[in-house]
């Protein structure tokens, strides 16, 4: 099949059994490789879905200025889609944006609007949204994607990965285990799969320091999981359990995934691996689990896959100062893991 544009290559990602990480006699774990989308992440799906439906219905006009609060994957996905659709795009970002993501956005020609003031939760999300509202007020024709409250976010995953997983598996899964941030992914896929498998148990994987499920805000560094603000989309009734994973454990989960499966994935994928480990540790029977690996590891070379960064995170968790070479706390290097 010949695609008309790179946007038409979004979706249809493979579902892979993680048979080297998990013994099939104790668990079958299937992971959808969303990092294989053209712009490198699961966020390609809502970016395409929201833009194309907006253009089709007229809520987005040709040449419209699209604005979104994102320092990561959605910003990159929107930059790609807007480039193909002839739209102008500005990403509202904060100081936590990685140098790699900033360079990618600029390569796509995206505008960059940066905030520096922290919000009431100690993060930047509220401040970024405030800046978005200011931009909309000064440019009435602009359109805010609003991944936190736009129902087309979860609809894109309902009709995307949800449909694809339902078609791919020959029998029901016991659990859906997914990282959560805006909550669009987990809600969309859970709602679709529960049509097929009403007994499906949905487990959200959240970051330590995230406020999504009522915990107090705290420091966290990895993007793509957790939030400093509860999104309008979040419906806790669709979620059965929540597992919190900190940055260090998530990074170690990524390294295990790379070591055992050869899958070079981003931080939230490692958090999911850790969550599945915890679930299986208390399982009383073999389980069939479905998950997603949302993005590529290349965007985390300065964090998850950097030994000095990992040593700093380990020191913070231990409450002291430590380097990667410190004898007081052994932090395995990437070479040791591999």
Swiss-Prot record:
Please give the biological process terms from Gene Ontology that the record holds: cysteine biosynthetic process from serine
User: Which keywords does this chain's UniProt record carry?
Assistant: Plasmid, Pyridoxal phosphate, Transferase
The protein's matches in InterPro entries, at most eight in alphabetical order, are given as: Cys_Synth/Cystath_Beta-Synth, P-phosphate_BS, SbnA, TrpB-like_PALP, TrpB-like_PALP_sf
Q: Which GO terms describe its molecular function?
A: transferase activity, transferring alkyl or aryl (other than methyl) groups
- EC class name: transferase
What reaction is this protein's catalytic activity? O-phospho-L-serine + L-glutamate = N-[(2S)-2-amino-2-carboxyethyl]-L-glutamate + phosphate + H(+)
Task: Give its E.C. classification number.
Answer: 2.5.1.140
Name the residues that bind pyridoxal 5'-phosphate.
73, 181-185, 268
Pathway involvement of the protein, from the record: Siderophore biosynthesis
Which SUPFAM superfamilies does the entry link to? Tryptophan synthase beta subunit-like PLP-dependent enzymes
Cofactor(s) recorded for this entry are:
pyridoxal 5'-phosphate
The record's section on Pfam families has: PALP
- N6-(pyridoxal phosphate)lysine modification sites? 43
Source species, domain of life: Bacteria
Q: Which NCBIfam families match?
A: PLP_SbnA_fam
Function of the protein:
Catalyzes the synthesis of N-((2S)-2-amino-2-carboxyethyl)-L-glutamate (ACEGA) from O-phospho-L-serine and L-glutamate.
Q: Which family does it belong to?
A: Belongs to the cysteine synthase/cystathionine beta-synthase family. SbnA subfamily.
What assembly does the database describe for this protein? Homodimer.
Q: What is this protein called?
A: N-(2-amino-2-carboxyethyl)-L-glutamate synthase
């Amino acid at each position: 099949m010949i695609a008309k544009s790179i946007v038409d290559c979004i979706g249809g990602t493979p579902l892979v059994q993680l048979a080297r990480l998990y013994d099939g006699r104790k668990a079958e774990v299937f992971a959808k490789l969303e990092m294989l989308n053209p712009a490198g992440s699961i966020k390609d799906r809502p970016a395409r879905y929201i833009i194309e439906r907006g253009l089709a219905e007229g809520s987005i006009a040709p040449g419209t200025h699209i604005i979104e609060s994102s320092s990561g994957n959605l910003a990159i996905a929107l930059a790609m889609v807007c480039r193909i659709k002839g739209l102008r795009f500005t990403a509202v970002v904060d100081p936590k944006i990685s140098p790699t993501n900033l360079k990618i956005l600029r390569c796509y020609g995206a505008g960059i609007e940066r905030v520096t003031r922290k919000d009431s939760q100690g993060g930047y999300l509220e401040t970024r949204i405030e800046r978005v509202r200011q931009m909309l007020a000064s440019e009435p024709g602009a359109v805010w994607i609003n991944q936190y409250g736009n129902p087309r976010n979860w609809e894109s995953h309902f009709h995307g990965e949800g449909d694809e997983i339902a078609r791919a598996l020959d029998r029901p899964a016991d659990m859906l285990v997914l990282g959560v941030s805006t909550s669009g992914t987990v809600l969309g896929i859970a709602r679709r799969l529960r049509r097929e498998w009403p007994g499906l148990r949905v487990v959200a994987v959240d970051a330590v320091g995230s406020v999504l499920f009522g915990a107090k805000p705290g420091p966290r560094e990895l993007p793509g999981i957790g939030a400093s603000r509860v999104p309008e989309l979040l419906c806790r009734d669709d979620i059965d359990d929540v597992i919190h994973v900190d940055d260090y454990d998530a990074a170690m989960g990524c390294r295990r995934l790379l070591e055992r499966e050869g899958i070079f994935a981003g931080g939230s994928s490692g958090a999911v691996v850790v969550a599945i480990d915890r679930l299986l540790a208390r399982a009383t029977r073999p389980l069939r689990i479905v998950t997603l690996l949302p993005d590529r590891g290349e965007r985390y070379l300065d964090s998850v896959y950097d030994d000095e960064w990992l040593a700093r995170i380990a020191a913070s968790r231990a409450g002291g100062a430590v380097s990667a070479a410190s004898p007081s706390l052994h932090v395995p290097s990437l070479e040791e893991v591999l």
